């Protein structure tokens, strides 16, 4: 007890006297450490911007924490106050846009839960709502949009999901080539370059995971293989260049090899 912080002691007292008449909710921003939840990770229900303590055990699944009540979360999403993200002429700072991932995650998890229980109409409804209120053409964050890729496919709008995935992959390659073209004095931006293979893997995984949910593992495998083709092509072109340059000049191509190889990690 002596080593406990006051907030831990307060939480212990709340839990000791908890009678389930009023809910205990944990902020989405505070779940990064299990200690903050008193290691109750498996007894949570995802309610959008918070997690509610419930007497139902739900082990973490593919990185998603907590159970989802499809109808409850659908109502939460429908009652969101979205702000003014849909106005393309309005600029928001990073603090405001950081909430976008929570909005889209709510839509994704609600949409998947609805679709899996057979209510694909409601799933598509909130997907369209999210696109209307937070247009992907302006807010093209890969982390949050990749979750919507999965939801589109599971909800029966496969073409829209694949189109979004392909656009994200093209944008990632475009950004990758841009950062790679910068001179050495911009080394501080190398972190952005290293993010791109990870982002690419998120998109590919989003599609393959959707097919897995639908029992179409072969389609998921084929998509992964096809997504590796542009990477293999880039790698093959570099190898051919090296063979033509000879031993001495080939050392100048080593950075290109490392950049291409970094993408192979998504397998």
Regions found by a protein language model. Name each.
Residues 1-266:
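ER/secretory pathway lumenal C-terminal domains and tails of membrane proteins involved
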């Amino acid at each position: 007890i002596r080593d406990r912080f006051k907030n831990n002691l307060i939480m212990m007292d709340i839990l000791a006297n908890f009678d389930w008449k009023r809910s205990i909710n944990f902020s989405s921003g505070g779940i990064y450490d299990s200690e903050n939840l008193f290691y109750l990770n498996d007894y949570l229900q995802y309610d959008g911007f918070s997690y509610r303590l419930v007497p139902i055990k739900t082990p973490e699944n593919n990185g998603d924490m907590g159970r989802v009540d499809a109808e409850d979360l659908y109502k939460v999403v429908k009652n969101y106050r979205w702000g003014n993200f849909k106005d393309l002429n309005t600029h928001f700072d990073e603090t405001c846009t950081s909430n976008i991932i929570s909005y889209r995650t709510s839509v994704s998890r609600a949409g998947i839960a609805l679709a899996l229980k057979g209510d694909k109409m409601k799933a598509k409804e909130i997907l369209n709502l999210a696109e209307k209120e937070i247009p992907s053409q302006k807010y093209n964050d890969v982390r949050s949009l990749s979750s919507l890729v999965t939801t589109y496919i599971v909800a029966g709008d496969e073409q829209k999901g694949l189109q979004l995935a392909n656009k994200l992959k093209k944008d990632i390659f475009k950004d990758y080539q841009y950062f790679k073209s910068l001179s050495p004095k911009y080394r501080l931006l190398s972190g952005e370059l290293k993010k791109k293979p990870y982002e690419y893997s998120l998109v590919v995984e989003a599609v393959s995971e959707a097919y897995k949910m639908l029992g179409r593992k072969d389609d998921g495998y084929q998509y992964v293989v096809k997504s590796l083709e542009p990477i293999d092509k880039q790698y093959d072109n570099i190898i051919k260049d090296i063979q033509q340059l000879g031993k001495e000049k080939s050392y100048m191509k080593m950075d290109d090899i490392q950049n291409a190889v970094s993408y192979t990690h998504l397998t």
